Amino acid sequence: MLQSCIIQNSKQENCEQIEIIIREINEGGIKDIVFSNADGGVFYINRGLERGLTLQGMKNKVLNKKVTLHLAKIITGTSSNHIAQISLGEEVIYTEFN
Protein backbone atom coordinates (compact mmCIF):
# COMPACT_ATOMS: atom_id res chain seq x y z
CA MET A 1 0.00 0.00 0.00
CA LEU A 2 2.72 2.47 0.94
CA GLN A 3 4.49 1.79 -2.35
CA SER A 4 1.51 3.21 -4.27
CA CYS A 5 2.23 6.64 -2.75
CA ILE A 6 5.80 6.77 -4.04
CA ILE A 7 6.49 9.24 -6.82
CA GLN A 8 7.90 7.09 -9.55
CA ASN A 9 9.43 9.53 -11.99
CA SER A 10 9.55 13.33 -12.02
CA LYS A 11 9.80 13.67 -15.78
CA GLN A 12 7.74 16.31 -17.53
CA GLU A 13 5.77 13.73 -19.51
CA ASN A 14 4.84 11.95 -16.24
CA CYS A 15 3.29 15.05 -14.65
CA GLU A 16 -0.06 16.80 -14.70
CA GLN A 17 0.16 20.48 -15.61
CA ILE A 18 -2.20 22.94 -13.90
CA GLU A 19 -2.45 26.71 -13.48
CA ILE A 20 -3.30 28.25 -10.11
CA ILE A 21 -3.10 31.61 -8.38
CA ILE A 22 -0.92 31.35 -5.28
CA ARG A 23 -2.71 32.82 -2.24
CA GLU A 24 -0.48 31.61 0.59
CA ILE A 25 3.08 30.28 1.05
CA ASN A 26 4.30 28.58 4.23
CA GLU A 27 6.81 26.08 5.55
CA GLY A 28 5.48 22.59 6.17
CA GLY A 29 6.70 19.05 6.63
CA ILE A 30 10.48 18.81 6.74
CA LYS A 31 11.65 22.06 5.13
CA ASP A 32 8.92 21.83 2.46
CA ILE A 33 7.57 24.97 0.81
CA VAL A 34 3.77 24.75 0.79
CA PHE A 35 1.62 26.74 -1.63
CA SER A 36 -2.15 27.22 -1.27
CA ASN A 37 -4.69 28.55 -3.73
CA ALA A 38 -8.10 30.19 -3.18
CA ASP A 39 -9.93 26.89 -3.75
CA GLY A 40 -8.18 25.22 -0.82
CA GLY A 41 -5.68 23.32 -2.95
CA VAL A 42 -2.34 22.66 -1.28
CA PHE A 43 0.86 21.85 -3.20
CA TYR A 44 4.46 21.55 -2.06
CA ILE A 45 8.12 21.56 -3.10
CA ASN A 46 9.70 18.70 -1.19
CA ARG A 47 12.52 20.04 1.00
CA GLY A 48 12.46 23.28 -0.96
CA LEU A 49 14.20 25.15 1.84
CA GLU A 50 17.15 22.75 1.50
CA ARG A 51 17.33 23.39 -2.25
CA GLY A 52 18.28 27.06 -2.10
CA LEU A 53 14.74 28.45 -2.07
CA THR A 54 13.40 30.76 0.64
CA LEU A 55 9.88 31.53 1.81
CA GLN A 56 10.41 35.27 1.36
CA GLY A 57 11.93 34.78 -2.09
CA MET A 58 8.96 32.67 -3.19
CA LYS A 59 6.50 35.17 -1.71
CA ASN A 60 8.20 38.03 -3.57
CA LYS A 61 8.14 36.05 -6.81
CA VAL A 62 4.78 34.25 -6.98
CA LEU A 63 2.38 35.34 -4.21
CA ASN A 64 -0.99 36.39 -5.73
CA LYS A 65 0.23 35.49 -9.21
CA LYS A 66 -0.86 32.82 -11.69
CA VAL A 67 1.73 30.06 -11.97
CA THR A 68 1.99 26.80 -13.85
CA LEU A 69 2.64 23.70 -11.76
CA HIS A 70 3.83 20.33 -12.99
CA LEU A 71 2.53 17.85 -10.41
CA ALA A 72 4.32 14.51 -10.18
CA LYS A 73 2.22 11.38 -10.53
CA ILE A 74 2.46 8.47 -8.11
CA ILE A 75 3.00 4.89 -9.28
CA THR A 76 -0.74 4.36 -9.85
CA GLY A 77 -0.78 7.28 -12.32
CA THR A 78 -2.72 9.58 -10.00
CA SER A 79 -1.45 13.14 -9.63
CA SER A 80 0.08 14.09 -6.32
CA ASN A 81 0.47 17.52 -4.72
CA HIS A 82 4.25 17.29 -5.18
CA ILE A 83 5.52 20.13 -7.38
CA ALA A 84 8.11 18.90 -9.87
CA GLN A 85 8.24 22.29 -11.60
CA ILE A 86 6.79 25.75 -11.01
CA SER A 87 6.84 28.48 -13.66
CA LEU A 88 5.73 32.09 -13.82
CA GLY A 89 5.06 32.83 -17.47
CA GLU A 90 8.12 31.63 -19.37
CA GLU A 91 10.38 31.78 -16.29
CA VAL A 92 11.04 28.48 -14.53
CA ILE A 93 11.23 29.22 -10.80
CA TYR A 94 12.05 25.66 -9.71
CA THR A 95 12.40 22.35 -11.53
CA GLU A 96 13.33 18.75 -10.85
CA PHE A 97 13.59 18.04 -14.58
CA ASN A 98 17.05 17.56 -16.09
Enumerate the predicted regions with their spans.
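Sec-dependent bacterial lipoprotein signal peptides
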Residues: M1-L2
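Structural detector for short beta-strands of small beta-barrel domains
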Residues: Q8-K31
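OB-fold and OB-like beta-barrel modules that bind single-stranded nucleic acids
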Residues: E16-I22, N64-V67, L71
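OB-fold (S1/OB) nucleic-acid-binding surfaces
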Residues: G29-L49
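A short, sequence-level motif marking secondary-structure junctions
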Residues: N46-G52, F97-N98
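Short nucleic-acid-contacting surface segments enriched for D/E, G, S/T with interspersed K/R
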Residues: G52-L69
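OB-fold/S1-family single-stranded nucleic acid-binding modules
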Residues: I74-N98
